Every structure is written in structure tokens, then in C-alpha cells.
């Protein structure tokens, strides 16, 4: 299993209850595709560089997951179908990117 960063931008106008429903759906989707969440950074509402669906802000969630197979195809394509999900980005986490070489 490899480690990936899963970054999501959600609709910024979600209530706390709707946000919890979206988080539960995301985690269920990850589990159903054989991924395990190792870390969740709930960044919250942030201003975006350009509007997405006429919104200047987005609610950011950044997951670190361990998954096998092709999470871009399996997980991201499923999450993109949700109405409240504005953007999905899956990036393979490589340890050599985190260490600075002199």
C-alpha cells in the first residue's frame, strides 16, 4: 500500500450538519475502496485564487491516506460525483519530497 494526499474543496456554505454528512460519506468511500485514513487536516473555509461554481471561498479538507490500486480512478471519481464537492486532488506522497537535500 502506498501513501497518498487527498485534498478536497467543498461547498463553503454547508451547515455543520451537512459538513458532517459529507465527511462521513468521504470516510465511508475511502473504507469501501480499501483505503485507511492516517491523518485529517480540517482547514476550514479559505479564500480561493479564482472562483469555482461562482464561489470565492471553499471548505478545505486534506487527508493523508494509505491505499492500494489506483485511488485517482477509484476514490476520486466517486467523490467528484457529489454535489457539494468542488475539487478533488490525489497526489502520491513520496518521502524524498519531504527531505531537503543539501
Swiss-Prot record:
One of its GO terms (molecular function) is small ribosomal subunit rRNA binding. GO terms for biological process: translation. This is Small ribosomal subunit protein bS6. Binds together with bS18 to 16S ribosomal RNA. It holds the Pfam family Ribosomal_S6. GO terms for cellular component: cytoplasm; ribonucleoprotein complex; ribosome. The keyword Acetylation does not apply. NCBIfam families: S6 (TIGR00166). The keyword Ribosomal protein applies. It comes from the Bacteria. Belongs to the bacterial ribosomal protein bS6 family. Keywords: Ribonucleoprotein, Ribosomal protein, RNA-binding, rRNA-binding.
Amino acid at each position: 500500500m502506498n501513501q497518498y494526499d487527498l485534498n478536497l474543496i467543498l461547498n463553503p456554505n454547508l451547515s455543520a450538519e451537512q459538513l458532517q454528512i459529507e465527511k462521513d460519506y468521504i470516510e465511508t468511500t475511502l473504507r469501501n475502496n480499501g483505503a485507511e485514513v492516517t491523518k485529517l487536516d480540517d482547514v476550514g473555509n479559505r479564500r480561493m485564487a479564482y472562483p469555482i461554481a461562482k464561489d470565492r471561498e471553499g471548505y478545505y479538507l486534506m487527508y493523508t491516506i494509505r491505499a492500494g490500486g489506483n485511488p485517482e480512478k477509484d476514490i476520486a471519481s466517486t467523490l467528484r460525483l457529489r454535489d457539494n464537492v468542488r475539487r478533488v486532488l490525489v497526489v502520491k506522497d513520496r518521502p524524498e519530497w519531504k527531505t531537503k537535500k543539501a
